[in-house]
Amino acid sequence: MKRSSVFYWFTGVAIAAIAIGAAFYFDAAVRDFVAHHQNRALLHLMHNVSRLGDWPEHFVLGLVLTGIAWRCGNKKWTRVFLSMLIALALAGLVGRGIKIATARARPSVKMEEVLYWSRFSTKYHSFPSGHVAASVAFFGVLFLGSWRIGLACIPIPILIGLSRMYIGAHYLSDVVCAAILGILCALLVAHFLLRQIANRQSRIEN
């Protein structure tokens, strides 16, 4: 591994560790702030924004985009959109496993003893945010495939994360850790699937 790659990975891990630590530290403060600044109109809006992060919506969008790209004969974008779907599925599976393993109660749920069977209740699926992990993984691959288009879509997972905290579904740490999980899934999928596109394009240019 090149020194530059080691440096980037080390920097990324350091930033992630600091972000996770800070998120857990400010969990209670952010939860209390949100609870004191909720209003009915904004709560209704945030519920609708939160639905944008639902897994089926991302999956259908990915399928439609893949179908269009395949129909147009664009191999690059067919691979990109398929990679987005794979990253979406990976983030969903890993996130679900972590939710069941940690069984963290949502901010809106009163603290009580967590029995084994309650691990499978959505009330105890706070950590990490599945909506955020899926959205970040999905659009993260798009960013790695085309940073200009991906950059324009970055506000979507950000708004989803804010909405999940506002409606009391997640803590700040749930959202931050989910974003990191989504980034890792996007990088992993892109490394194996999108790298072939970059190598092919570089050979054509050379």
Regions found by a protein language model. Name each.
Residues 32, 74-144, 149:
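Membrane-interface loops
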Residues 28, 32, 70-74, 100-108, ...:
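Transmembrane helix-loop junctions in multipass membrane proteins, especially transporters and channels
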Residues 27, 42, 65, 90, ...:
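Alpha-helical membrane-inserting segments
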Residues 19, 83-87, 91, 95, ...:
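Alpha-helical transmembrane segments in multi-pass membrane proteins
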Residues 2-10, 113-206:
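Membrane-embedded catalytic cores of phosphoryl/pyrophosphoryl-handling enzymes
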Residues 17-23, 89-96, 157-169:
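Aromatic-anchored segments of alpha-helical transmembrane domains
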Residues 1-62, 99-121:
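N-terminal transmembrane-helix/juxtamembrane module of multi-pass inner/ER membrane proteins
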Residues 3-7, 39-42, 71-79, 83, ...:
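Juxtamembrane/transmembrane-helix boundary motifs in multi-pass membrane proteins
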